[in-house]
Amino acid sequence: MSANPSARMILAHCGSNTGPEDVKPLFEKYPNFFCDLSERSVPKIPAKAFVHKPEKMVFGPDGIVSGWKDLIEEMPDRFLVGSDVYDGAKYAKAIKVIRKGLLGNLSPETVEKVAYKNAIKLFGLQ
């Protein structure tokens, strides 16, 4: 990104094993750096997996991990919602977890950005 500062980069799965303390410096250094929040919650990752690797979870059915919530609210222009669910049977559950666990725990302004406005802006959609 240093070689091409105007390039945009979306970190898939927000890095998978990263914490907010890993991502924030990248946001501060690179204005065109973004994270998608897919594959960091159930049902994409089975709940039992988070027992052994709790750092993988950003949000779940009951809310957002505190450090992540703080960063998403602080820098809402840098996050995009995602599911990565390819199994139709799990899609409805994934959307429910996103709506209740993620979007249901953010301010209305942040919800709009994370849910759709950031994607519209980033991808030039109208």
PLM feature spans:
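Catalytic pocket-lining loop regions of alpha/beta-barrel enzymes
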Residues: 1-80
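Short histidine/acidic/glycine/proline-rich micro-motifs that form metal-
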Residues: 41-42, 85-87
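Mid-to-C-terminal alpha-helical segments outside catalytic/metal-binding sites
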Residues: 66, 70, 74-80, 86-126
